[in-house]
Amino acid sequence: MSLATLAVTVLVLNASNLSTHKGILKGAAVDEASAAETRAPVVGPLDIDQTLAGTEPVFVSDYFSFIGADDKGHVAFAMDNDRSRNGSEFTADAHVVLHDEHLGWIAVSGAGSYENTKKELLRIPDSPNFKFYGDVNNGVILDSPHNGLKLSVAPMIERLSRPGIESVFSLGSAEATLKWRDRTIRGRVIYEYIFKKNLSPWYSLFSGLFYTDFQGLYLMTEDGGDFYFRASKGEAWSELGENVLGFQVLGGNSEVLKDLHIEVLERSYAFGFYRWPKTWRVSWRCKKGAGTLSAQVVDQITVTNWLIGGFAMGIVTGELSYDGTVRPIYGLAELIR
């Protein structure tokens, strides 16, 4: 998820669109009316133009999670970019991961904090290692010659949005192509956007403590569909939506998941006083009936360890069953304990 998260990034957002639409992306979020049945009504939405003109602390996060495959196997790439304003101080941070199905986790330059010299919040500031072109509504490019990679994302389609009094949270997905080394890898991006005001200035330092057992899975089906869910027991980000939510895009049909139930069947050991989720059984309901997902982490990297908790990314495989069809899945898991 964007936040203590990672994964791919991008954007030059239009501020007027942000302040006048439920979400930030073109088109209405699918099944928004039925999705609203599962949450309390919100008063809003947040006026982003007015917020930017004010002096309140502001936090903005863009998260792109890419999954693709070519004849050499699967590749996963994710970047999360966070910007904040606290008084006269403007910051920028990037979290980046890259994984090859056969080579494992690949070192990528450009992770960490960097200077936000232009005091940019809506647009992702260029860093020494990454440049950003375009916008999410019309297509965006993330280019890093130093790392030998270039991610091109088609215009984003909104799948779910949660406008609030002090926040905007949107989810989208789109086709994407990653050029890495001598490979051209076609796949999908699942995108998360957060704009929140009055966030604690301690968030960036202690972001993991804002979550309780957060699990976010960003999956691509073998036939090019999307599946996303997140679950958390914490209440710190309740305004951004239910603690359990998700969507699927199968056969070109986009739906918000209803009656979503997530069960962790197995946990693995961590270096500390906690355990990582390792295998899941997930069930839900959509227009064509019930669906199930079985998934497991097959490779994992610990990004941060707080001893009482931590932050990790994992590669996930498994099967998704819906409407009489069983689809293999491959993707990324973001885990915060």
Q: Language model features by range: what are they?
A:
Residues 14-337:
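Structured soluble/peripheral alpha/beta segments that form catalytic or ligand/cofactor-binding pockets
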Residues 2-14:
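Hydrophobic membrane-insertion alpha-helices, especially the h-region
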